[in-house]
Amino acid sequence: MSDSNSTFKDLGVAKWLAEALNSMKITQPTTIQKACIPEILAGRDCIGGAKTGSGKTIAFAAPMLTKWSADPCGMFGIVLTPTRELAMQIAEQFTALGSVMNIRVALVVGGEDIVSQALELQRKPHFIIATPGRLAHHIMHSGEDTIGGLKRVRYLVLDEADILLTDTFSDALATCVQILPPKEKRQNLLFTATMTDQVLALKDAPPTSGKPPLFSFHVENLDDLAVPASLQTTYLLVPEHVKEAYLYQVLSSEEYKSKSAIVFVNRTISAEILRRMLMQLEIRVTSLHSQMPQRERTNSLQRFRANAARVLIATDVASRGLDIPAVQLVVNYDIPANPDTYIHRAGRTARAGRGGEALSFIAPKDVSRIQAIEERIGKKMDEFTKVGDTALIRKSLNKVTVAKRESLMAMDKEGFGERRKTQRSKGKQTKSLHS
């Protein structure tokens, strides 16, 4: 690996790109960048592992852009990622880095107009940043003039590869990959924050004939996924029927009323109920979940980044990768089934040595999950004592109950949830057509 004082130019990055990075105040390569950039430039397939915020995007973007600038023609590379927000963020970075070279970047994600995307693909963008489901839709339904360029791409990147290699994405991913050049004729780059069995299986696969050996690198202690030492991990035993009242009491308490927070839930309907309820209770709140139209999701993120909202209610779409400023409090309103998900959520606070707190609401059914999390992070959670006065909870319970009831009535009137049923129905019909 390159020495600790390496510059991007030392790593082999094109002069124009090193200057572009410098203008963005990115001057010192991170560990993952120093390890992977020279190897990718040398033509090796790569598996790179590092925690969120370690610079993984530039680790694959810099060598791809360097090679592209030497021969800037046609569709050059595809980056697949599991969420729309991550895709948008990566597309923004590619566009910013390549703007001096007139780069063309296409964003192909759900929630946006399909016809406009098809027209954009026909214009042969240099790089396509996509979610697998939407790109697979174009491959199955668009003409050769739209997707023909995919057959000649030189790079395939799977970002957040551990998620993309799960069953959730397997069908769409297979559709995307089958139209690309065979693996012998393209470079395959996988980046992840978690080394799962599926990722390790690819690492240990037999070498591809005619290609240099696979390069695999992960930043030390990645597999430990240890939570930062500056993070307080706390729990609060909360009866299920008064969880909303406890959440309101925490967020509006003297201790937390001016602090930024992300509240993680397991279901989209919970995110929507809590957003509406807290808004009625005059807390500056926004939300992020898969049932929101794309424009609303983008606006919601922008509001939270700009501190127009101090509380973000989110499903796990917000736990990884997204460029969200570090917050002071993470609340696990619902406990995740996977301990690693807890770690990714908690990673939204206590960054860069700063303090932070991850508070988990625990109902009796969650005890086994908490034990698994404590075993995974190697430490016991402390009991949360800052808020929890039962008299105060009882006092706020009535207005919280009213706010929740009014929120549910409004959602029912608007048909919230019907959209999801329609989407599921369409998905089943589409799947049956292609089965």
Curated annotation (Swiss-Prot):
> What's the stated role of this polypeptide?
ATP-binding RNA helicase involved in 40S ribosomal subunit biogenesis and is required for the normal formation of 18S rRNAs through pre-rRNA processing at A0, A1 and A2 sites. Required for vegetative growth.
SMART domains given in the database record: DEXDc, HELICc
Chain ranges of the Helicase ATP-binding domain: 37-213
The record places domain Helicase C-terminal at 246-393
> Which positions does the motif DEAD box occupy?
159-162
Under what name is this protein listed?
A: ATP-dependent RNA helicase DBP8
The GO terms describing molecular function are: ATP binding; ATP hydrolysis activity; RNA binding; RNA helicase activity
Is rRNA processing one of the keywords? Answer: yes
> Carries keyword Ribosomal protein?
no
* Family matches, as InterPro entries: DEAD/DEAH_box_helicase_dom, DEAD_box_RNA_helicase, Helicase_ATP-bd, Helicase_C-like, P-loop_NTPase, RNA_helicase_DEAD_Q_motif
EC no. given is 3.6.4.13
GO terms in the biological process aspect are: endonucleolytic cleavage in 5'-ETS of tricistronic rRNA transcript (SSU-rRNA, 5.8S rRNA, LSU-rRNA); endonucleolytic cleavage in ITS1 to separate SSU-rRNA from 5.8S rRNA and LSU-rRNA from tricistronic rRNA transcript (SSU-rRNA, 5.8S rRNA, LSU-rRNA); endonucleolytic cleavage to generate mature 5'-end of SSU-rRNA from (SSU-rRNA, 5.8S rRNA, LSU-rRNA); rRNA processing
At the top of the EC hierarchy, this enzyme's class is hydrolase
| SUPFAM superfamilies according to UniProt | P-loop containing nucleoside triphosphate hydrolases
Q: Enumerate the subcellular locations listed in this protein's record, separating them with semicolons.
A: Nucleus, Nucleolus
Q: Which organism is it from?
A: Eremothecium gossypii (strain ATCC 10895 / CBS 109.51 / FGSC 9923 / NRRL Y-1056) (Yeast)
Q: Which Pfam families match?
A: DEAD, Helicase_C
Composition bias type Basic residues, residue spans = 421-435
Compositional bias (Basic and acidic residues): 411-420
